[in-house]
């Protein structure tokens, strides 16, 4: 699924680096590779979930925009706003994701 999403975003003009888990993402961020947006599922393989990944990533790159994905209805928008991110609910269509990625990239960091 991860690679399908990455391919869909690439076909819509986005530059995408897809990694298998949060640990790898953090390793890349610690190498001071600059990213505009972190798109992460809240529930992921490995020890670190999407919330913790975003928190650590923001400490490394304070201007990084965050877009969370979840299939769980109990995740509130208020929780996401508190963590300075945006949320897309699964399942989503590729065009919906592209729209949300654009919105997140264009946001000024204020709550939506």
Q: What name fits each language-model region?
A:
Residues 3-11:
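Charged docking surfaces used in two-component/phosphorelay signaling
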Residues 13-20, 28:
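Short hydrophobic/Thr-rich beta-strand motif most characteristic of the beta2 strand and flanking loop
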Residues 21-24, 48-53:
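Acidic catalytic/metal-coordinating carboxylates
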Residues 23-30, 98:
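Alpha2 helix of the CheY-like receiver
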Residues 30-33, 56-64, 76-83, 103:
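Conserved phosphotransfer cores of two-component systems
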Residues 41-42:
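Active-site residues of response regulator receiver
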Residues 67-69:
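Hydrophobic/aromatic residues positioned on beta-strands within the core alpha/beta folds
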Residues 92-105, 109:
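C-terminal output helix
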């Amino acid at each position: 699924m991860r690679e399908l999403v990455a391919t869909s975003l690439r076909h819509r003009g986005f530059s995408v680096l897809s990694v298998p888990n949060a640990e790898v993402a953090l390793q890349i961020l610690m190498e001071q590779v600059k990213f505009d947006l972190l798109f992460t599922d809240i529930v992921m393989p490995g020890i670190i979930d999407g919330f913790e990944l975003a928190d650590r990533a923001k400490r490394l790159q304070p201007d990084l925009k965050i877009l969370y994905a979840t299939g769980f209805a109990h995740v509130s928008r208020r929780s996401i706003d508190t963590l300075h991110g945006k949320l897309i609910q699964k399942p989503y269509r590729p065009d919906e994701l592209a729209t949300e990625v654009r919105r997140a990239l264009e946001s000024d960091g204020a709550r939506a």
